Amino acid sequence: SMSEKEYLYSEVFDSIQGEGTYTGVHTLWLRFFLCNLQCNGFGQLFPTKPETYELPFESFDATTVNRVEDLPVWDKGCDSSYTWSKKFKHLMGKKTPKELCEVIKKCASNETNPEGMFLHPISKMKSHMCFTGGEPLMAHAQMASVQMLRHFYNDNNVPGSVTYETNGTQKLRDDFIAVSYTHLRAHETES
């Protein structure tokens, strides 16, 4: 079999979703590296005047940190510039989709869910999966998420729901659309 490509990501974590339809739902997050936008106008005093922008990430010495968690949160420009600026590339993880699935399972595992399943073995609650970035619908990230979802299906460990935090600029790949419909149909047939 063809060996899987490795993808750059900045972090995997779990938390309770705080926005939108899945507010309050336990969520596993994968934050991909790279974005097609930079959004330097965020938080600026004069967002329509780029010549006035302050971009604190630009002057930050990225060699002083070795973990994403130790970066400051910028209040001007993109608050997650570490997810796309090349100067932070040394902080990124690099794994195949199958390895990323294992990292996510490990993140989800605890004393009551030792296997890290999306369907909690005791409460029967289903965890949510959120792909974010960066831009999680750039072609490389779409490919990675499609392969990851296939691995989750093959392992009979399917997220209760899946969302993408996207800027909405990317064309959807055919395999992405196909795996999305598969996921929707699987949920429609559940009792």
Language-model features, listed with the residues they occupy:
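Generic structural "secondary-structure junction" signal
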Residues: S15-G18, S80, A186
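Single conserved hydrophobic/aromatic residue that forms the stacking wall/gate
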Residues: H183-S191
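Conserved Radical SAM active-site core
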Residues: Y7, L37-A178
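Auxiliary Fe-S-binding modules of radical SAM enzymes
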Residues: M2-G20, G24
